[in-house]
């Protein structure tokens, strides 16, 4: 089986597809992006279930807003102790539909030209999304939440109590 090979726009080395990221429509190898840092694995604890999808063009999501379900793996039940007593949570999830990154673009919120770190774009190098949500109810290991902007099928990495709720 033939592997796709790309020439890095940063250093000129040839690398396999799985060892590059596309930034501003140019292949950049992981060595140019991350230097000597050591990659690590993160395992999902569940998955988002809703009707949201990424828009084909422009910015944002498409689909009905409202309640999303977070289907946690059965193994996560033990970590849900007294979760139903909380009103607001922070959901950390993986932006699994992101294909490429633009370093500078017009922000969807106000069309201001900004870099990735000055935005909420899903097109990020880390592919990590974070969203505060309202907990509506829990059924077994399924959380029903309001305000989640993750698309259907997004792997959930972590759930935390919303920070501002700790200070009240």
Can you say where each PLM-predicted feature lies in the sequence?
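Mixed-charge, low-complexity intrinsically disordered regions
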Residues: 1-129, 141-168
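Conserved positions in beta-strands of structured domains
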Residues: 49, 133-136
